[in-house]
Amino acid sequence: MYRVNEIFYSLQGEGANTGTPAVFVRFSGCNLSCFFCDTDFSSYTEMSVEDIVSAVSAYPARLVVLTGGEPSLQVDRKLVDALHAVNKYLAIETNGTRPLPEGIDFVTISPKETGKIILQEADEVKVVYIGQDVERYTAWISAPRYFLQPCSEVKNGVQTDNREEVIRYILNHPHWRLSLQTHKILNIR
């Protein structure tokens, strides 16, 4: 059984697949504790492979985004094979601290300050920028695309982020690209 926080249908809001219709399977639980995490781990539903495949198949999109939390704590070859059997294209958003099962079609590593990265290759690297040394990620992880994402916080009831700082960094380091959380800008899931 898998602990699933939610399954929903929307547009991918981040990275290279921004704007692509996708079914999101958000797994509960994580091996890290990041202050900017937007996932509620307190509630989840236990689901079988068949339950997940059925829920995902209710939507027309081929892209399925396995996210969390940290999906590598739960995603296994059995689930990957079952989703491929119904012609789904699987993307995973991982912190890169755990091995992934074979068969994932698109890997996004979103490294965190508190975890030791073991994955060395990805389709993209997406870093939430909090002023840290991000160049080390380009040395540690081979990927065709590297994205910086502003860190959003709510202070005194007002949403703020470090967007200007991120833009300055990218302009000075043009191998990085900007990734905004467009789903939040558009006020969609």
Regions found by a protein language model. Name each.
Residues 2-9, 21-24, 33-104:
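Conserved Radical SAM active-site core
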Residues 10-15:
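A short beta-strand-turn-helix
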Residues 72-189:
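Conserved AdoMet/S-adenosylmethionine-binding subsite of the radical SAM
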